[in-house]
Design a protein with these regions (language model features):
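Charge-biased, low-complexity intrinsically disordered regions
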Residues: 1-32, 36-116
Length: 116
């Protein structure tokens, strides 16, 4: 629940404050944002599975973002579009986590509905 509240708070802050990111940083920011979203979806999944740990979430949130942006920067300096691989990996993980979240919610709903 903390992850969802944090995500909503971040979205509201992003809408209220007009933050312009220079175009040259957009590949790094996009990969970092995907990494953060991956951590948020992972936290929601862990929370529904009753295995959420705040320290794991926070370290993964910032660690994934920094690592993804650093790899995108390194790839840019080497002339290799590494950020595309990061987008594919994080995108796949986000969809996997979403599928698991969906199943967990449906299973909880069914168990409450039928009183299991």
């Amino acid at each position: 629940m903390i992850a969802i509240i944090g995500l909503l708070f971040g979205i509201i802050l992003g809408v209220v404050f007009d933050v312009n990111i220079p175009e040259r940083f957009s590949p790094y920011m996009s990969v970092a944002i995907l990494a953060c979203l991956d951590s948020v979806f992972g936290a929601v999944r862990a929370n529904l599975s009753k295995s959420f740990q705040a320290d794991i979430f926070i370290s993964g949130f910032f660690g994934n973002a920094v690592l993804a942006a650093a790899l995108a920067y390194l790839g840019d300096k080497l002339g290799i579009p590494i950020y595309i691989a990061a987008v594919i990996v994080f995108g796949g993980r986000i969809f996997d986590n979403f599928a698991i979240i969906r199943r967990l919610i449906i299973e909880k709903y069914k168990s409450r509905q039928w009183g299991d």
